Swiss-Prot record:
It is found in: Nucleus. It comes from Xenopus laevis. Coiled coil: none annotated. One of its GO terms (molecular function) is DNA-binding transcription factor activity, RNA polymerase II-specific. GO terms for cellular component: nucleus. One of its GO terms (biological process) is regulation of transcription by RNA polymerase II. Pfam families: zf-C2H2 (PF00096). May be involved in transcriptional regulation. The keyword NAD does not apply. A zinc finger (C2H2-type) spans 1-23, 29-51, 57-79, 85-107, 113-135, 141-163, 169-191. This is Oocyte zinc finger protein XlCOF10.
């Protein structure tokens, strides 16, 4: 579709109609699809993408596309570290309103998700899903190295450190590292004041922990 006044060509007739308004001298730019008017042609052109489905504005951080620049600008705040949503109770800030809503339940005690089996209530859907596995016996997380299965993803991740050799849990006293939190907890008892043999590791001699408690 070509403009008879300047010979500029367009793929769609609607684009040609938008362009012709530049030659008409009319200050009101009207959308041929919905009739909405704009003061500037650039605003009309941006608006027209809503009808064509064209995504022109792309987020540099994640590549997500938007039809309007204002929508992209609002989205980009999530990458800038800005946290515009503030909790009126404690002043903590959040990037998204949904995060604030979840946080506020710590103040209100609201637990909207209930287990139909036990009647227990939870703050988050994810907590309920984890809990329901205790009724079904489901263990969806399987170790590809040894085949051992786990109910919770956190337990699965901790188990995998046995195979990778990754030491994540570190003793704050002597900086010794462990693949499991339970092993770190057992080790830390050797640093306690009531341990008469601090040089002995309760992880090596598990019976010592019981002796000290008695």
């Amino acid at each position: 579709f070509s403009c008879s006044q300047c010979d500029e060509s367009f793929v769609q007739r609607s684009e040609l109609e938008l362009h012709r308004q530049l030659h008409s001298g009319d200050k009101q730019f009207t959308c041929s699809e919905c009739g909405k008017c704009f003061k500037r042609f650039s605003l009309l052109k941006e608006h027209h993408r809503i009808h064509t489905g064209e995504n022109t504005f792309t987020c540099d951080e994640c590549g997500k596309c938007f039809t309007q620049k204002s929508h992209m600008t609002a989205h980009q705040k999530s990458h800038l570290g800005k946290k515009p949503f503030c909790c009126s109770e404690c002043g903590k800030h959040f990037k998204q309103n949904s995060q604030l809503v979840v946080h506020q339940r710590t103040h209100t005690g609201e637990k909207p998700f209930t287990c139909t089996e036990s009647g227990q209530w939870f703050k988050l859907q994810s907590y309920l899903t984890e809990h329901q596995k205790s009724h079904t016996g489901e263990k969806p997380f399987s170790c590809s190295d040894c085949g051992k299965c786990f109910k919770r993803h956190s337990l699965f991740i901790e188990h995998q450190r046995i195979h990778t050799g990754e030491d994540t849990f570190s003793c704050s006293v002597c900086e010794k590292t462990f693949t499991r939190r339970s092993h770190l907890t057992a080790h830390e008892k050797c640093h306690e004041e009531n341990n008469p043999f601090p040089f002995l590791n309760t992880l090596t001699f598990p019976g010592l922990a019981q002796i000290f408690e008695d």
